[in-house]
Swiss-Prot record:
Cofactor or coenzyme needed: Zn(2+)
GO molecular function terms listed in the Swiss-Prot or TrEMBL record: metal ion binding; ribonuclease P activity
Free-text function comment from the UniProt entry: Component of ribonuclease P, a protein complex that generates mature tRNA molecules by cleaving their 5'-ends.
Keyword Transmembrane applies: no
Organism this protein belongs to: Saccharomyces cerevisiae (strain ATCC 204508 / S288c) (Baker's yeast)
GO biological-process terms attached to the record: intronic box C/D snoRNA processing; tRNA 5'-leader removal; tRNA processing
Residues annotated as binding Zn(2+): C90, C93, C115, C117
Descriptive protein name: Ribonuclease P protein subunit RPR2
Stretches the record annotates as Disordered: 1-22
Ranges in a coiled coil: none
UniProt-listed InterPro entries: Rpr2/Snm1/Rpp21 (IPR007175)
Family to which the UniProt record says this protein belongs: Belongs to the eukaryotic/archaeal RNase P protein component 4 family.
EC number, UniProt record: 3.1.26.5
Oligomeric form and interacting partners: Component of nuclear RNase P. RNase P consists of an RNA moiety and at least 9 protein subunits including POP1, POP3, POP4, POP5, POP6, POP7, POP8, RPP1 and RPR2, many of which are shared with the RNase MPR complex.
C-alpha cells in the first residue's frame, strides 16, 4: 500500500487530488444476504413478466410478496439496496414499476410514474442532466 515511515507504520498513499488510495476489499461482507436479495428481485421480475405475458393477475400476489420479503430482509440485515433497484419498486404496494398505470412529465421537469395502487413516484429529470448517483459514478469501488 504505502512506504514504511520511521516508526514502522505504513504511510498512506494519496493521489494528486488528495484522495486516500485504499485497496478494494478481498471479500464482500454478508455476501449470502446480497445473493438472497438478488434472487428475490429476479424471481419477482420473472413472476411479473409471466403475468404480463399471460395477461392475468395470478402471479401478482406472489411477485409482490417476494419484493416485500426483499425489503424486510434488507432492513433486518441492514443491507442497502442500490438506488436503481429502489426506483423500480412501489413503496406502498411492493409492485415492480415496469408497466405503470400512468406516466407523464410535469411542467417542472419531473417524471411522474403512477402505480396500480394510485401511488405517484416522482423523478427529477430536468434539474441536472449530468447528475449521477454514487453507484453510477466513475472511480468508485463498485465499478472496480
Amino acid at each position: 500500500m504505502g512506504k514504511k515511515a520511521h516508526g514502522g507504520k505504513m504511510k498512506p498513499e494519496i493521489d494528486e487530488n488528495g484522495t486516500l488510495l485504499v485497496p478494494p476489499p478481498r471479500t464482500i461482507a454478508n455476501q449470502d444476504h446480497f445473493h438472497r436479495l438478488n434472487y428475490l428481485y429476479q424471481i419477482s421480475a420473472y413472476q411479473t413478466r409471466a403475468r404480463q405475458k399471460a395477461r392475468t393477475d395470478a402471479h401478482t400476489p406472489l411477485a409482490r410478496n417476494y419484493i416485500k420479503s426483499m425489503d424486510l430482509i434488507s432492513k433486518k440485515t441492514k443491507t442497502s439496496l442500490l438506488p436503481t433497484i429502489k426506483r423500480t419498486i412501489c413503496k406502498k404496494c411492493h409492485r415492480l414499476l415496469w408497466t405503470p398505470k400512468k406516466l407523464e412529465i410535469t411542467s417542472d421537469g419531473a417524471l411522474s410514474v403512477m402505480c396500480g395502487c394510485g401511488t405517484v413516484k416522482r423523478f427529477n429529470i430536468g434539474a441536472d442532466p449530468n447528475y449521477r448517483t454514487y453507484s453510477e459514478r466513475e472511480g468508485n469501488l463498485l465499478n472496480s
